[in-house]
């Protein structure tokens, strides 16, 4: 460990040198070489100092490794194009932060200081797991208790470390944080579902001590249904917001923001406000994508994108507002390119983890509601959102999953969507029946594609599916290691069986080397830079 800490110290000294160096890239080459040694040694040492993957410090290490690689890439370009000091400082500050966080995390791992994971540190999905497992425990014990021993059960239940009321409160906090950026109709529905959940939780706890086990079982089931209802709707609201945000990224892009600021700085405030709102939405989508995702590499990439976008969000608009000069143009250009690259990575990784059938279903719901709408602006918007589905299948991993019939229908989708875009964007008046006809064809083609994908997904696992039927009342979610696994099916993410997030009993050596593979990925990136 002393060698790792010494390498980090050397890296920090080189970053300090970078603040004062102008045009000299020698210190950056030395930094890359030293950091490569550090990452290689860390890969060999990590199974020893972090035997379990379920660790906040390990997550921080992976995030920092990814951020260092990202910053080095853009810092190299910044130096080569002789961008101004403020551009260089932006990336140096982020590198410095990463090195300091790496130092803290490694020190805690070396000292066997396991960070206490409070409820505040749990994701929405982890909190749902805790709450549902909590209720499962209670229901199992309730079934074994006679009425005369029910009071003993109630006393032991309330003494649990993670009291259910506290867990539910944190679930509601996550849901309301998302509701703050959700579309208006979903915000109202999420708020109502949160109120219902809190009411059911209050009833469950207020009735503690009720001598009738039948009543207690009904109250527990009502609370469980309220939890499922909230999780299920949040999945759908997340998909709604994804459609809205990805389109808003086009309508309020950095390029359009830059043009608006150059033409009319005062009049660009509305676009700046829309840009800020969309960044808040992207952050919430990312947070929930991390919570729902099963793969540690995917989680790390999303975390890194969010970290980059958050740091850029604070400085990209001011960069575009700087007085026009060569240095300010270079500064804005570097930040703009970095921003667009991070958005592209974010968009691709979200499309990679999202469930294709659920995405199409969500769009079909929106399309079905608006087919007969006469307002042309609304029709343009809904057709534009269809491009999100097309983009989803531009990703090789999603397109390759289509059968031959699916690929044929996908071609039909592209053709009919182009027709819809053409007809709603015509400047001359168009017979509404022509628009409705094309939208109905679009709906039919999408429904056919959805049915083909769902059929293909079910056929390989039909034997498994027959053994573990999903109840009709279940939400469209599932969990990593929760006992409620069989009851839940997440609509946001693909339903994959190979989960690479470790339970507390798993070790790095026994986990398929996912953590080591992730470090190998980072090392490869660093080598590519050299």
From Swiss-Prot:
Sorted keywords for this record are: Cell membrane, Cytoplasm, Developmental protein, Membrane
- What superkingdom does the record give? Eukaryota
GO terms for biological process, alphabetical: actin filament organization; cell migration; cell-cell adhesion; cellularization
Q: What is the membrane topology here?
A: Peripheral membrane protein
Tissue specificity, please? Transient expression in blastoderm from nuclear cycle 11 to the onset of gastrulation.
Which cellular component appears as one GO term in the record? cleavage furrow
Q: What molecular functions are annotated in GO for this chain? A: actin filament binding; beta-catenin binding
Task: List, alphabetically, the InterPro entries matched.
Answer: Serendipity_A (IPR008837)
Coiled coil regions in record = none
UniProt subcellular location: Cytoplasm; Cell membrane
Function summary = Required for the cellularization of the syncytial blastoderm embryo. Involved in the localization of the actin filaments just prior to and during plasma membrane invagination. Sry-alpha together with nullo and bnk may provide auxiliary functions, by acting both to stabilize a large and dynamic microfilament structure and regulate its functions.
Identification of the protein by name:
Serendipity locus protein alpha
Source taxonomy: Eukaryota, Metazoa, Ecdysozoa, Arthropoda, Hexapoda
